[in-house]
């Protein structure tokens, strides 16, 4: 994988940012998380007057070999069917992108279906789904690197068009499984506590998923001498859509863009990215805490404060997109509210 040069924002501006926010005509801290978000965006952009320009959403699609083990209630056909649905504008992600002015890119990273007849889907297919990580690595290191590079390429495309705030989403049946395993490996949390029902497994289905993922992790430890090493665990368990998202997150941070992070799967990708480059978290805005088991604990691993708590678990980036207007409000607050001096209001604290 390429080396990224991700720098923490220069701290020398933080005092001036806080002073500006504290002197807006309101009680100090009274706008709560909006003030925290405004400070973060100012720090990312290194300015007292931040802007959000040409927001883009990258929707990565890919299938997973582990799906063959019955770890998801949805069949893998749902991946390609939804990808086509997105081209017709009928998905949740489409509606939220339209509502909030995001340019949507639909990317086939590794869907187990020929989607070349759909020109609105960017064909970056690396393979027709990953291998089954119960028995072998999901992909080779070369395939993982190619997926990461694809994510970088797409971020570069958005950035060249003037985008400075970007969101990622995914479509991939069974991708809660690698996400749970990464949470276990990178967070040192018991595996069973990281595994949830995904798209709606019943109790026997959830128990079966736990058995399969336990065996997959055991096999990983047997096959890999340096078990637990981040750079081994990434290609071993990743989906192509997840590797693409990791590349996109790292490249966006390198370009000092604001990265809107969605639910369980995209949070797992950010967790993985932060294992390689901890500085990436400076650029991450966590849209929501979802209803998937373990998501809150995963967010806690990154010391993340999510914006919304709506019980969502759709994926696609929908939770992050829903949170975007709150980020807009934070930016408008720091740019448009008057301060005590200009408003001729007595400062009372």
Show the residue positions of the predicted features.
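N-terminal loops that bind phosphate or other acidic moieties
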Residues: 1-349
């Amino acid at each position: 994988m390429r080396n990224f040069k991700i720098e923490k924002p220069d701290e020398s501006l933080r005092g001036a940012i806080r002073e500006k926010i504290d002197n807006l005509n309101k009680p100090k801290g009274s706008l709560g998380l909006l003030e925290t978000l405004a400070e973060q965006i100012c720090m990312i952009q290194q300015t007292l007057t931040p802007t959000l320009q040409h927001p883009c959403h990258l929707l990565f699609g890919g299938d997973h070999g582990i799906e063959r083990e019955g770890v998801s209630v949805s069949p893998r056909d749902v991946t390609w069917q939804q990808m086509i649905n997105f081209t017709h504008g009928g998905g949740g992600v489409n509606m939220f992108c339209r509502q909030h002015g995001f340019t949507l890119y639909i990317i086939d990273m590794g869907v187990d279906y020929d989607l070349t007849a759909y020109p609105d889907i960017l064909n970056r297919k690396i393979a027709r789904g990953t291998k089954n990580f119960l028995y072998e690595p999901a992909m080779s290191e070369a395939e993982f690197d190619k997926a990461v590079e694809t994510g970088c390429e797409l971020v570069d495309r958005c950035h060249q068009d003037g985008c400075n705030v970007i969101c990622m989403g995914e479509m991939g049946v069974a991708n809660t499984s690698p996400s749970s395993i990464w949470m276990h490996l990178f967070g040192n949390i018991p595996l069973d506590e990281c595994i949830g029902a995904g798209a709606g497994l019943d109790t026997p289905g959830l128990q079966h998923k736990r058995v399969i993922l336990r065996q997959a992790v055991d096999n990983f430890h047997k096959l890999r001498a340096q078990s637990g090493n981040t750079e081994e665990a990434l290609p071993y368990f990743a989906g192509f859509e997840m590797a693409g998202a990791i590349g996109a997150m790292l490249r966006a941070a390198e370009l000092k863009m604001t990265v809107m992070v969605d639910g369980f799967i995209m949070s797992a990708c950010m967790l993985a990215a932060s294992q390689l480059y901890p500085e990436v978290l400076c650029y991450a805005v966590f849209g929501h805490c979802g209803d998937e088991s373990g998501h809150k604990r995963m967010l806690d691993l990154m010391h993340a404060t999510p914006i919304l708590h709506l019980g969502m678990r759709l994926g696609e980036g929908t939770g992050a997109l829903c949170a975007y207007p709150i980020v807009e409000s934070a930016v408008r607050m720091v740019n448009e509210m008057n301060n005590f001096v200009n408003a001729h209001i007595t400062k009372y604290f």
